[in-house]
Regions:
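Extracytoplasmic Ser/Thr/Pro-rich, glycosylation-prone low-complexity segments
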Residues: 19-240, 412-413
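Proline/serine/threonine-rich low-complexity linkers at boundaries of modular beta-sandwich domains
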Residues: 234-243, 443-451
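Local sequence-structure signature of Cys/Sec-based thiol-disulfide redox active-site neighborhoods
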Residues: 350-387, 392
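Enriched for extracellular/lumenal, surface-exposed ectodomains of secreted and cell-surface proteins
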Residues: 282, 320-337, 575-577
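Intrinsically disordered, low-complexity Pro/Gly/Ser/Thr-rich segments with frequent PxxP/GP/PP motifs
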Residues: 285-314, 528-529
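Short, conserved sequence motifs used for protein processing/export or organelle targeting and
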Residues: 385-582
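Short, solvent-exposed loop/linker segments at the N-terminal edge
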Residues: 251-258, 461-465
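Bacterial Sec-dependent N-terminal signal peptides
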Residues: 1-23, 237-239
């Protein structure tokens, strides 16, 4: 009897092991997995950046040569070292597969697909720009190997629509991702590509994304922020797994405004979730709980849940907020690591309206800078009196802007700007104003509270080119603490005309002439709530004007100037944290 029982246990254990397969978690408009690849979706070997081309245009479906995986990796629990890709939209670890790939797609599992394959099946490389590329992102131990299907044509719609999508292998986790990046159309004859997304272990076992083989791509921008991805995990899917994706707790909150806390929750378990508990805690205090029932949250479904007890802050200052779920369907969550999201926010008593600081990197030799400046002007004109502008004329492309100075170079390095046009908004990373910045983006920045009043009391120009100005800072909160805060000041010229070059612009606005006292600003200390501090700043321009031939022939700030009209000067001041750049 004992032997029979042991044999029965062995059978159960074997059955459990055999039941393991891939399951997936879908993330829509979530960016790229892990955030390692921040490149434009259309980046390839042609535009640099370390991509390796496996194959280009191919009239008929073919395989690439096999490629080594750059780190240890397992597929379905077994080590694999190489892969190859098919121009019809999949990769396979069965590098010995010889059957000619078919364009497809078909439902998974399919005898037409090799064993051990990852599928974005349903494309071709018939176009002149089509191709498959690879690149490794990240550092040892936490790398991702990307296999990108670049500008792939849609079967039956050659020349009208293209897809950019990738298969991603992740070091350490052995997770596999399918990333849908970008979809383009040429004209109204566009036919939406249809794909079979999933992983096929063999001709009888597969994990297929719901809707395959008829998943259609949404048209999207060529930026990672709007990408969709599917995360495939090998193992037994949890039955109960409620993952908290995000919450609505803002970075800044008025102490007098009760906040109704909400959380976006995704069901990553196999069982439908009908009820759970939503919790929050402030500064490690007692949990505030709410029962949420009446749910029909299926696998990979997302719902925004609302807590029934609003939070009214008891005091101003920094607060640590934790939001989490528990007890899905009355039982323990089997993956507690994804149950919680946290935030550190500032609760304030008083705030001032914000003027959004725009530092614009441009050049008169940069063709896209002209429409970029036009786009910015349209936003500024629509929101008068709520912004400040400072423009840095750069030393590239080509010979660069003749009004480039070494101080522009310092600011460009500070913000890590490597292309123009680029607009830095309140210290945030530069964006291309040609489609990368909208009135809605502006409004979001302007809605952020400001915790200091900054006032230029006097600004005077003497006939000898000396500019004197007095500035007062009045903190409204004890927010600006530490040694990283700076008073940044600049003298700019409202309109210049003589730095015309090759991009078609004939006049330039708010051109920075001198940072005062330097690009490093004035160090601030001992800032206290309600206590004004006053600063006297001054700069005398040299009396020698010179128009450089190129940016390489830049002026010497100690002995020369590019000011065209001293009576057209303006002063710009702003507060900045040197560490966070805000």
């Amino acid at each position: 009897m004992l032997k029979k029982l042991l044999f029965g246990s062995a059978l159960l254990l074997t059955a459990g092991l055999q039941a393991q397969s891939y399951y997936y978690i879908s993330s829509m408009r979530a960016g790229n997995p892990g955030g390692l690849n921040t490149e434009n979706d259309q980046q390839s070997d042609a535009s640099g950046g370390g991509w390796t081309k496996l194959i280009g245009q191919a009239a008929n479906p073919v395989y690439t040569n096999k490629v080594a995986i750059p780190f240890a990796f397992e597929f379905a629990g077994n080590a694999v070292t190489h892969l190859k890709a098919a121009t019809s939209g999949y990769i396979t670890f069965d590098t010995g597969a010889t059957a000619t790939p078919i364009t497809g797609p078909a439902a998974l599992p399919s005898a037409s697909l090799p064993d051990r394959s990852v599928s974005i099946w349903g494309m071709s490389a018939s176009g002149s720009n089509d191709g498959i590329f690879t690149k490794t992102f990240g550092t040892a131990g936490k790398r991702q190997f990307w296999i990108k299907f670049f500008s792939m044509s849609t079967p039956g719609d050659a020349g009208n629509s293209w897809t950019y999508a990738s298969v991603v292998l992740e070091e350490g986790t052995n997770n596999i991702y399918i990333v849908i990046q970008n979809c383009l159309q040429a004209n109204n004859a566009y036919v939406s590509p249809k794909h079979a997304l999933g992983i096929q272990i063999n001709s009888s076992t597969a994990s297929s994304v719901k809707g395959s083989p008829n998943i259609t791509n949404q048209l999207s921008d060529a930026v990672p922020e709007d990408n969709d991805f599917y995360q495939f995990i090998y193992g037994n899917q949890p039955t109960r797994d409620a993952a908290v994706l995000s919450h609505n707790v803002p970075n800044y909150l008025s102490r007098t405004a009760p906040l109704t806390i909400k959380a976006r929750v995704r069901n990553q378990g196999s069982a439908e979730i009908n009820n759970l508990t939503l919790n929050y805690s402030i500064n490690g205090g007692a949990p505030v709980t709410a029962s949420v029932s009446g749910l029909t949250l299926g696998n990979n479904d997302i719902n925004e849940l609302t807590h029934t007890t609003p939070w009214l802050p008891a005091a101003s200052g920094w607060a640590n907020v934790m939001v989490w779920t528990s007890n899905p369907n009355g039982g323990a969550d089997e993956t507690p690591a994804n149950d919680t999201v946290k935030a550190r926010i500032y609760v304030y008593d008083s705030a001032a309206p914000r003027k959004v600081m725009h530092e614009v990197f441009s050049s008169s030799t940069c063709p896209p800078c002209r429409p970029g400046n036009v786009a910015l002007a349209a936003i500024f004109d629509a929101r008068p009196g709520t912004h400040c502008i400072l423009k840095y004329q750069c030393d590239f492309p080509g010979t660069g802007d003749p009004y480039y100075t070494t101080e522009v170079g310092t600011k460009r390095s500070f913000y890590a700007v490597n292309s123009v046009p680029a607009t830095v908004r309140d210290g945030l990373p530069g964006v291309n104003p040609n489609g990368g910045y909208s009135i809605d983006d502006y409004d979001g920045l302007q809605a952020k509270p400001s915790f200091a009043r900054l006032k230029i009391n006097t600004a005077q120009l003497s006939w000898k080119g000396k500019v004197d100005f007095n500035v007062t800072i009045t903190p409204l909160e004890d927010y600006m603490t530490g040694s990283n805060w700076r008073l940044m000041a600049a003298i700019s010229e409202k309109t210049t005309f003589r730095n015309v070059e090759t991009n078609g612009e004939t006049e330039f606005h708010h051109v920075m002439k001198k940072m005062v006292p330097s690009p490093n600003g004035t160090v601030l200390s001992n800032l206290q709530k309600g206590v004004p501090q006053s600063f006297d700043l001054s700069y005398t321009f040299p009396d020698k004007y010179r128009l450089p031939n190129t940016s390489a022939d830049r002026i010497n700030l100690a002995t020369e100037t590019t000011v065209e009209d001293f009576w057209d000067l303006e002063v710009v001041v702003f507060l900045q944290n040197n560490a966070t750049k805000e």
